[in-house]
Amino acid sequence: MTTLLNPYFGEFGGMYVPQILMPALRQLEEAFVSAQKDPEFQAQFNDLLKNYAGRPTALTKCQNITAGTNTTLYLKREDLLHGGAHKTNQVLGQALLAKRMGKTEIIAETGAGQHGVASALASALLGLKCRIYMGAKDVERQSPNVFRMRLMGAEVIPVHSGSATLKDACNEALRDWSGSYETAHYMLGTAAGPHPYPTIVREFQRMIGEETKAQILEREGRLPDAVIACVGGGSNAIGMFADFINETDVGLIGVEPGGHGIETGEHGAPLKHGRVGIYFGMKAPMMQTEDGQIEESYSISAGLDFPSVGPQHAYLNSTGRADYVSITDDEALEAFKTLCLHEGIIPALESSHALAHALKMMRENPEKEQLLVVNLSGRGDKDIFTVHDILKARGEI
């Protein structure tokens, strides 16, 4: 199919979907390209971001955790956004696109529940019906977010097949959309999947990096040495990275979930420890068995528990423009506790992975003068029960 925008990032990306979905993807691409040129659409989107979601979000300088080092550490506070995470940014854009295309329903998948909450709130705001697929395991470990979705009128559908996590929810959402695309828009929650989703999600998240650049220049008079973000599918990270890609003096660091340790096989780090294949409508690195079956990913954080990654991250990794590392559950949990105890901020477990790597950079070279920005992609309210149970089992509380 001829596309208006390039569907690939190097060799990664594409549109590997059943033929029945091609017209829906073409319609979506046309609507997006048209909307990007429409001042009225942009004004409506920007108004929602400012007056509904609460942008711009703060850039907070850490006061205490850098003590004894020469690191200056800032947090981009996406946790302060309405809905509790960066997810709200792009769902408002996609919901406006859905209305523009004349759709009346939203289909979404969710892992941690943050994209589900964001989809539910955008649907409620704009008068769209909403059904959300969620792995049965995630329904259990993210019960507060499940209730939030239902409070806002969304139908939450637990998925029991496979590993009963995010990848299975994605499969069910795509299956639903195959039969309902004439009236429904599939509101994909990350910068992955078939074209044009990776591009759409990046563009509807890029204000994270744009704001960060303006704020850090105002505060410090220079660009950061590195920006750091967690990577599951990769939407918060690509939103942070997008405006810095051409700033070659700024390091881009993506942090994948190392789970129980890469050597155990129980992780979610396909960029560094997967193989390229076709999954979820795209060509990208993914966790696979020797015979090519999709392997189960694992992370303490439901939002990073995904066996593949967005194609632009795969490209940035292949060219060396961005560096990708992994952080274990234990390291993320320590970072979570550190931010709570010393800065009075409760981060999402997803964001705690990015914070953990920043703390590691700081502690490994305390004499080095460095200016770092961590994208604090979400707040940790949803994770307090998970953390409570772990700390209780360890006898720490």
UniProtKB/Swiss-Prot annotation:
Enzyme class: lyase
Keyword ATP-binding: no
Keyword Lyase recorded: yes
PROSITE patterns xref list: TRP_SYNTHASE_BETA
Pathway: Amino-acid biosynthesis; L-tryptophan biosynthesis; L-tryptophan from chorismate: step 5/5
The protein's name: Tryptophan synthase beta chain
GO cellular component, one term: cytoplasm
Keywords: Amino-acid biosynthesis, Aromatic amino acid biosynthesis, Lyase, Pyridoxal phosphate, Tryptophan biosynthesis
GO molecular function: tryptophan synthase activity
Residues of the signal peptide: none
CC cofactor: pyridoxal 5'-phosphate
HAMAP family: Trp_synth_beta (MF_00133)
Record EC number: 4.2.1.20
Classification via SUPFAM superfamilies: Tryptophan synthase beta subunit-like PLP-dependent enzymes
